[in-house]
Amino acid sequence: MENLKYVLEMENISKEFPGVKALDDVQLKLKPGTVHALMGENGAGKSTLMKCLFGIYEKNSGKILLDGVEVNFKSTKEALENGVSMVHQELNQVLQRNVLDNIWLGRYPMKGFFVDEKKMYNDTINIFKDLDIKVDPRKKVADLPIAERQMIEIAKAVSYKSKVIVMDEPTSSLTEKEVDHLFRIIKKLKESGVGIIYISHKMEEIKMISDEITILRDGKWISTNDVSKISTEQIISMMVGRDLTERFPKKDNKAKEMILEVKNLTALNQPSIQDVSFELYKGEILGIAGLVGSKRTEIVETIFGMRPKKHGEIILNGKTVKNKSPEDAIKNGFALVTEERRSTGIFSMLDVAFNSVISNLDRYKNKFRLLKNKDIEKDTKWIVDSMRVKTPSYSTKIGSLSGGNQQKVIIGRWLLTEPEVLMLDEPTRGIDVLAKYEIYQLMIDLAKKDKGIIMISSEMPELLGVTDRILVMSNGRVAGIVKTSETNQEEIMELSAKYL
């Protein structure tokens, strides 16, 4: 590997904004046919570095070399035309057009004055065959699942004959099977000599797929290493600038009396959950595990009144409650932090203050239905202080905050409703290591205040590190409930497959 030249070299890159040095002498060198992980907390400079590569930001100093030749792209289009492409976490596609249009838009192969439909189709099929993508190129993109839409973006990058492909959190919305398929595609790209920059917060993935890793912190280059020669603990320590002796906080919450009992809960619209029963105790963190498609999310959405139930009982503090809508659920003492933070959790173009109080806006209106700004500011301050939200001001657009800080605002917003049961669906998806640790600590602190916490997670280490008990779902049914201290990954995986 050492004898290979670099396909991409970013040397001594610096970028300043008014009052902020976002990048300070950063370097990244990518070898052809390798996967190079780029890691760092949110705000470490990963996005800014990639924006300098793609010409979205103009760097203040430093050099970018592609195949040994200095380049200064002025736009993403210019980068693409020179073989540098990116598969974004938030897919940028024309949903109402078909797959062919999304790959070739703006550069259709022509035959005289007309688009050469046959060549376009055949070229697409050839790329799909090479990458083992089984998608009908004439299908509308809106009708495809997220995994297939992502494969199309990779195929588009290949159609540009890309030498360098940047993948930003590519597995954040994929099932295990889809992740395996993505990794097979990455292997094929490596074999064809493509260099891949892989941005992810998932340690297990990084260790599995990457050859080298570069770590940034506070806009500075910290380290570049062979992945095989660096431990997870060393990576975390370099990212956060101090030793996190444990990936998870000390658990000092204690389960007390029962707060919630769910009996034979069955959703109206099937296939969904069937006869789900469990108990939740004050001071307890109950994890919900299961494969994607096992109907974990459907449990909390049915409890929260987002889905109608066919039958079953929800008993809170000994009294049966009827949550026919989220409004009912909130009044009855439930809160739900949804899985899709960007689409259902935040209003990204609105400020932190508005996003802090939106769950209970009527509470902030006076008798003339005008907003009481002092009350909004007071509660926003409480959220920012108690959740340790990093934001320049309350009027900052929430979309400009890191994923971890957005998530803290959402959790804080729900705490203002004073829930007794807090349900969190994939609460740490797409956020960095330190922000994850802070959210784990927050959950433990809330449990210590006698809240009942339910957490759905696809990350096994997280479930084993934070919860007291784990309910395992399999095909809409409860396969088992186990004490976290007495179980392991193998038992949970076996239970997950029980009713398949």
From Swiss-Prot:
How does this chain sit within the bilayer? Answer: Peripheral membrane protein
Location comes to: Cell inner membrane
Q: What is the similarity comment for this entry?
A: Belongs to the ABC transporter superfamily. Galactose/methyl galactoside importer (TC 3.A.1.2.3) family.
- Entry keyword annotation includes Translocase: yes
What organism does the UniProt record list as the source? Fusobacterium nucleatum subsp. nucleatum (strain ATCC 25586 / DSM 15643 / BCRC 10681 / CIP 101130 / JCM 8532 / KCTC 2640 / LMG 13131 / VPI 4355)
Q: What is its main location?
A: membrane
Report the protein's function: Part of the ABC transporter complex MglABC involved in galactose/methyl galactoside import. Responsible for energy coupling to the transport system.
Keyword list (alphabetical) reads:
ATP-binding, Cell inner membrane, Cell membrane, Membrane, Nucleotide-binding, Repeat, Sugar transport, Translocase, Transport
Residues holding ATP: 40-47
Q: Which residues form the ABC transporter domain?
A: 8-243, 257-500
Q: Which domain of life is it from?
A: Bacteria
What EC number(s) is this enzyme filed under?
7.5.2.11
**Which GO cellular component term is one of those annotated?**
plasma membrane
Name under which the protein is recorded: Galactose/methyl galactoside import ATP-binding protein MglA
Annotated catalysed reactions: D-galactose(out) + ATP + H2O = D-galactose(in) + ADP + phosphate + H(+); methyl beta-D-galactoside(out) + ATP + H2O = methyl beta-D-galactoside(in) + ADP + phosphate + H(+)
What quaternary structure, including any partners, is listed in this protein's UniProt entry?
A: The complex is composed of one ATP-binding protein (MglA), two transmembrane proteins (MglC) and a solute-binding protein (MglB).
GO terms for MF: ATP binding; ATP hydrolysis activity
CDD domains from the UniProt entry: ABC_Carb_Monos_I (cd03216), ABC_Carb_Monos_II (cd03215)
Q: Where is the signal peptide?
A: none
Q: Name one Pfam family in it.
A: ABC_tran
- Check the record and name the SMART domains matching this protein: AAA (SM00382)
The coding gene here is mglA
InterPro entries per the record?
AAA+_ATPase (IPR003593), ABC_carbohydrate_import_ATPase (IPR050107), ABC_transporter-like_ATP-bd (IPR003439), ABC_transporter-like_CS (IPR017871), P-loop_NTPase (IPR027417)
